[in-house]
């Protein structure tokens, strides 16, 4: 197809003496003449049916306008001469009515003509067909036996366009196809072997004709398959192709289908192969029965074989494919515009098989008939020399072989045009020294103009060897100098006209790099910076400085930052290379470069096993990049893998060579290896481990360590050891052979090797051996064994059987008094090691206090003291002893913290790992008298309105003879100061004035310090200061009463509301709890018409319940009698209540009698009953630590004695009755009891009860002391 005339590109006529020209758009030739050029052509073949019109398109462009004409069967065809034939206005498209289609079918061609030539269209072959129909035929049933092949024919009507074939049944359901049943390319339905289930009366072949859009169907075929009792299998036989050797023609660029359909029983399977080369995949279809070749090329030429197999035999068919080609373009003739006198050459090179015949025509007339003046053919090309304006024409090149024609139109246009300067005048050019500059002078004219350049000195430019003028008029000046600047002149002319233009050349200084960057070496992960400076010609702006890496722009990476310098942070090996600094202007650029060298740790790869046996391996590997630092060594790491173990990699250093000497391997292991390269910058990264190397099991190479033998019970021996780790087993499992034998012969004859070894094989420790004499030495050893054998011979160790209680006790026990609270005890150990029956662990000193020096024997002992070791038929100690433990082989100890002026006894015993031995004989000693301490605390609490409780505590160092307590009422008009001599550190002062305050003082005896003073009061404390701000009122209802009260806004106090029936003797009952912030409370459950007393009860700081408001409330209504039969009227209930009241009355009487009764007490005895709790080892001795032998019984005694002795607690007796632990709650020790030994007997009465006092006189009270 020809190119448009305006804007046609300049094309070279290859091998020709001339070249076509293109009129530039800016030349302005708007009315330029154009030869005809076809834009729409009729198809090569057109098939029409009775209802279709024949439409043959033919449209062309040209100036002057184009005229159209047609030919039919190479004869002129005039549409106007045929009724029903017309031409579309404005084009050459031919329309033939459908009624004339059958009569006017044939070969048509279109011609488009104007003053410059004639363009010819390809031939269009018009075929008129009738509507396809199947001829009437008589269809007979197809009858076959089971297993026979069947072919159901289709035979559709013939057509220029083959139809698509479908096989369906009468329900319009497709016949299922598979390896046994399939449709061939001819439309027939093939059965490789018939089955009884194939019997159907309605096999219908449908043909779909795409042109007329019609589907027709064949008469149904009745297939009847008779069952057979003797179905025999048979070898395959080809149904298609019918000839075992078939030749197929395939056209280049098209597709071809090769087909093989076979019959046989069982159903054959088809496969394909190419005999003269490989078979490309993807072309097999239709259950392997077809092979399709797409986009056929000459390489597909050859033989293809199909093979049908079914186990009974083989059938083969060969397809010989010959590839041919319709004509196709190798070099197509091109249209062109030429000037007068030029030579034109039009090439027409066509390929095809068979080789096509080429025919040249001029304006649709064969060249032979058009005359040969100034035209000749050369190698298929048409050459036209010395062109003249009247040589303009349209030339046709048509190629043809048996597969069809190929036609191309190319016009030849000869024109004459005056000269026109296309480049603007006075253009300005800038260039840098030593560069090349191009000064343009574009011109156009036909014939082509001649161009000449003049320098600023008006000399021809071509006189300078540095200048060159191109055919398009441009001047090139190379290696420009500073003096080359100035105004240049271009002059052009052709046969019709001439013209000129000027160009200004300015020469600039080059751009230079003033401070080039320096190469750098950086370690991976560091930051590196490059600096660069440049100078620019001041007349050239702007100048730009850019950074590149390897000639490419810097990557889009935040690690690269560019400002006055370039910085690369966290450098990696990929950053290594050439760094360029480029300074550029619109005219030139300068560049300097530096090398970035990144160093780091080297990698290694491709680990391979060179040689391996049971106990060693040799490895090799490929060293990786050394990252600019030579590899110093390789570290070979080995890992052992087992099902029950996986330990980390162990390492071995290898010098620089990439292989290892033999490396040892442990038995029964899987050993992956990896290699790490090392250079001056450290170890490289690990590569993937190698495939594990497995070694067979072997006997253990070592025995377990930590073998120890020791008894944990008398007469046994427990042998333990540290089990081998799994990696030392050398096998899937390991056991232990444990052996033992006595170290000495019976009778102590010394070591002997005559004893046989006893042994036991176990999986894990321990091994326990029983029935042995106590603490006897044994030789023991443990050997590892596994399925491959025994470990090395084990070295025996020594162990001992279990210990027994010692039979020996300390002798020569003596006591040395050091001061009133410390003594030194010494002893020796009797007997020998055999009597010790174990390892000596230490000694225990057991001691206890008997009482004060000089007092009589105790009358009673603490209940159930804990048992201590003692000699037979010997009485136990009176108090639980205190134990001092001394570790090791000691021969003495210090006993400190003893009570002065006291009698003590002690015993010493030895102990081993099993326990304590028998104690020594008891040794008695006495401590000298000590110094009393001052009183430490005096506490006073109110008991009731006329009594106070007094508690005194001090640290005693000797026997106390008494206490002097002074007290005085502090209110105005009070009585004189009173006093009392106390024999007990706790007592009650009774008969005091009610609601009075007293000052009490307790001086020490002798008076080393001022007296200890305090203040007490018999006045009860109010519950809270807010009660004085209460305002209370009440009103009664029928079954309840509402009580309203007011208090300060910030008060939030809870209290109890109590009530009682005023007309009965019932006690106060609690209704509930109220809160001062609620301002009201409602009493519920009252009887109508009844008067009640109501009071509020709060708790003061001493914990007492105190009533702070009382009033009366009257409910409304009358009393309604309750119906009889209630529980309260039952006789059994009245009797039960009476019994409870009687028991409570008896208990109250007994308590009153006990509270009023006086008694005797002995301060001395109470002090004797205390166990000294301050005994502890002295810091200047090294005999060990104390261990108390007091049992839970002692704790229970202490807790029991304190249960009823708290101040103000229920059941508290008078001072004379004894209160053993009355100070225990105040932080004192248990030794706080005071009893007199008979020197003070009876009760002491005070100065007399006050006016408001009541109750019995205090037993603590005595004559007043002034």
From Swiss-Prot:
Residues in the signal sequence: 1-20
Matches recorded under CDD domains: FN3, Ig4_L1-CAM_like, IgI_2_L1-CAM_like
Disulphides: 58-110, 154-205, 260-306, 348-397, 441-490, 532-581
Region feature (Disordered): 685-710, 857-882, 1004-1025, 1163-1266
Keyword Cell cycle listed: no
Residue spans of biased composition, Gly residues class: 1199-1211
Entry protein name: Neuronal-glial cell adhesion molecule
């Amino acid at each position: 197809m020809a190119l448009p005339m305006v804007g046609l590109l300049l094309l070279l006529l290859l091998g020709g003496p001339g070249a076509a020209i293109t009129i530039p758009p800016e030349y302005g030739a708007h009315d330029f003449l154009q030869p005809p050029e076809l834009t729409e052509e009729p198809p090569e073949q057109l098939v029409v049916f009775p209802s279709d019109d024949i439409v043959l398109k033919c449209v062309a462009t040209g100036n002057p306008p184009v005229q159209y004409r047609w030919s039919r069967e190479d004869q002129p065809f005039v549409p106007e001469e045929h009724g029903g034939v017309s031409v579309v206005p404005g084009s050459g498209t031919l329309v033939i009515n459908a009624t004339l289609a059958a009569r006017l079918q044939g070969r048509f061609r279109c011609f488009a003509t104007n003053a410059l030539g004639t363009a010819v269209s390809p031939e269009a072959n018009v075929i008129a067909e009738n509507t396809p129909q199947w001829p009437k035929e008589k269809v007979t049933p197809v009858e076959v036996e089971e297993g026979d092949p069947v072919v159901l024919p289709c035979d559709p009507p013939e057509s220029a366009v083959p139809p698509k074939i479908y096989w369906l049944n009468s329900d319009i359901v497709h016949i299922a196809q598979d390896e046994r049943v399939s449709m061939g390319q001819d439309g027939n339905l093939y059965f490789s072997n018939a089955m009884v289930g194939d019997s159907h009366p309605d096999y219908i072949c449908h043909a779909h004709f795409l042109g007329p859009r019609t589907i027709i169907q064949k008469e149904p075929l009745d297939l009847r398959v008779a069952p057979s009792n003797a179905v025999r299998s048979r070898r395959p036989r080809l149904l298609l192709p019918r000839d075992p050797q078939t030749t197929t023609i395939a056209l280049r660029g098209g597709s071809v289908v090769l087909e093989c359909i076979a019959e046989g029983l069982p159903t054959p399977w088809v496969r394909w192969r190419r005999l003269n080369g490989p078979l490309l995949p993807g072309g097999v279809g239709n259950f392997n029965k077809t092979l399709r070749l797409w986009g056929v090329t000459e390489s597909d030429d050859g033989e293809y074989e199909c093979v049908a197999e079914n186990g009974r035999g083989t059938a083969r068919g060969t397809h010989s494919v010959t590839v041919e080609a319709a004509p196709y373009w190798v070099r197509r003739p091109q249209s062109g515009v030429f000037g007068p006198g030029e030579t034109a050459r039009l090439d027409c090179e066509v390929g095809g098989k068979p080789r096509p015949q080429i025919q040249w025509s001029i304006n649709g007339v064969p060249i032979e008939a058009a005359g040969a003046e100034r035209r000749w053919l050369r190698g298929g090309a048409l050459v036209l020399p010395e062109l003249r304006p009247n040589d303009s024409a349209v030339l046709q090149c048509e190629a043809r072989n048996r597969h069809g024609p190929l036609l191309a139109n190319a016009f030849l246009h000869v024109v004459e045009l005056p000269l026109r300067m296309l480049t603007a005048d006075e253009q300005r050019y800038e260039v840098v020294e030593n560069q090349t500059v191009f000064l343009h002078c574009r011109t156009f004219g036909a014939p082509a103009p001649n161009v000449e350049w003049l320098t600023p000195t008006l000399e021809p430019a071509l006189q300078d060897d540095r200048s060159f003028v191109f055919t398009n008029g441009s001047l090139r000046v190379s290696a420009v100098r500073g003096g080359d600047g100035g105004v240049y002149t271009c002059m052009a002319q052709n046969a019709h006209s001439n013209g000129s233009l000027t160009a200004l050349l300015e020469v600039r200084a080059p751009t230079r790099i003033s401070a080039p960057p320096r190469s750098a070496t950086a370690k991976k992960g560091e930051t590196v910076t490059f600096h660069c400076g440049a100078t620019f010609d001041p007349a050239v702006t702007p100048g730009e400085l850019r950074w590149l890496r390897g000639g490419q722009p810097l990557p889009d990476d935040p690690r690269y930052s560019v400002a006055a310098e370039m910085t690369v942070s966290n450098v990696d090996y990929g950053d290594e290379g050439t760094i360029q600094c480029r300074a550029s202007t619109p005219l030139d650029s300068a560049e300097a470069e530096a090398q970035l060298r990144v160093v780091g740790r080297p990698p290694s790869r491709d680990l391979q096993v060179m040689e391996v046996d049971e106990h060693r391996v040799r490895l090799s590997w490929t060293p990786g990049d050394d990252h600019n630092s030579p590899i110093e060594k390789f570290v070979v790491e080995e890992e052992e893998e087992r099902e029950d173990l996986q330990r980390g990699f162990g390492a071995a250093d290898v010098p620089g060579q990439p292989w290892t000497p033999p490396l040892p391997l442990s038995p029964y292991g899987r050993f992956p290896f990896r290699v790490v390269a090392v250079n001056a910058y450290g170890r490289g990264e690990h590569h993937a481990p190698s495939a594990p190397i497995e070694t067979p099991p072997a006997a253990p190479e070592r025995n377990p360590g930590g073998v120890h033998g020791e008894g944990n019970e008398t007469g046994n021996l427990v042998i333990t050891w540290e089990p081998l780790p799994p990696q030392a087993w050398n096998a899937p499992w390991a056991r232990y052979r444990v052996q033992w034998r006595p170290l000495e012969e019976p009778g102590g004859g010394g070591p002997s090797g005559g004893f046989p070894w006893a042994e036991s094989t176990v999986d894990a420790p321990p091994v326990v051996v029983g029935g042995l004499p106590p603490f006897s030495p044994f030789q023991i050893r443990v050997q590892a064994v596994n399925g491959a054998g025994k470990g090395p011979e084990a070295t025996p160790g020594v162990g001992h059987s279990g210990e027994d209680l010692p039979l020996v006790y300390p002798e020569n026990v003596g006591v040395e008094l050091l001061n009133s609270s410390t003594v030194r005890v010494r002893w020796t150990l009797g007997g020998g090691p055999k009597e010790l029956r174990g390892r000596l662990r230490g000694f225990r000193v057991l001691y206890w206090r008997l009482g004060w020096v000089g007092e009589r024997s105790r009358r009673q002992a603490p209940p159930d003291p804990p048992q201590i070791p003692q000699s037979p038929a010997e009485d136990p100690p009176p108090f639980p002893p205190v134990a001092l433990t001394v570790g090791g082989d000691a021969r003495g100890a210090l006993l400190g913290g003893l009570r002065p002026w006291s009698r003590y006894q002690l015993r010493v015993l030895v102990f081993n790992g099993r326990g304590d031995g028998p104690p020594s004989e008891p040794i008695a000693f006495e401590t000298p008298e000590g110094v009393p301490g001052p009183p430490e605390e005096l506490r006073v609490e109110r008991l009731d309105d006329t009594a106070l409780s007094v508690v005194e505590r001090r640290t005693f160092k000797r026997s106390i003879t008494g206490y002097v307590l002074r007290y005085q009422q502090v209110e105005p008009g009070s009585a004189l100061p009173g006093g009392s001599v106390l024999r007990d550190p706790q007592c009650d002062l009774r008969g005091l004035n009610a609601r009075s305050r007293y000052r009490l003082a307790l001086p020490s005896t002798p008076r080393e310090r001022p007296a200890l003073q305090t203040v007490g009061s018999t006045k009860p404390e109010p519950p809270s200061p807010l009660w004085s701000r209460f305002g209370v009122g009440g009103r009664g209802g029928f079954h309840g009463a509402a009580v309203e009260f007011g208090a300060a806004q910030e008060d939030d106090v809870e209290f109890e509301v109590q009530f009682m029936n005023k007309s009965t003797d019932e006690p106060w009952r609690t209704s509930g709890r109220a809160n001062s912030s609620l301002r009201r409370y409602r009493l519920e459950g009252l009887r109508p018409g009844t008067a009640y007393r109501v009071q509020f009860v709060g708790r003061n700081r001493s914990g007492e319940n105190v009533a702070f408001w009382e009033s009366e409330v009257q409910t409304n209504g009358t009393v309604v009698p309750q119906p009889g039969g209630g529980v309260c009227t039952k006789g059994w209930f009245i009797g039960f209540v009476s019994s409870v009241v009687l028991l409570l009355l008896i208990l109250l009487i007994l308590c009153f009698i006990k509270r009023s009764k006086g008694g005797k007490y002995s301060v001395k005895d109470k002090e004797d009953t205390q166990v000294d709790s301050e005994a502890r080892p002295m810091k200047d001795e090294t005999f060990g630590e104390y261990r108390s032998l007091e049992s839970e019984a002692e704790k229970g005694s202490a807790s029991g004695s304190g249960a009823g002795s708290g101040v103000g607690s229920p059941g508290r007796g008078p001072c004379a009755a004894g209160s053993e632990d009355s100070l225990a709650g105040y932080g004192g020790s248990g030794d706080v009891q005071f009893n007199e030994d008979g020197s003070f007997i009876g009760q002491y009465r005070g100065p007399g009860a006050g006016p408001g006092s009541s109750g019995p006189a205090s037993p603590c009270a005595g004559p007043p002391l002034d």
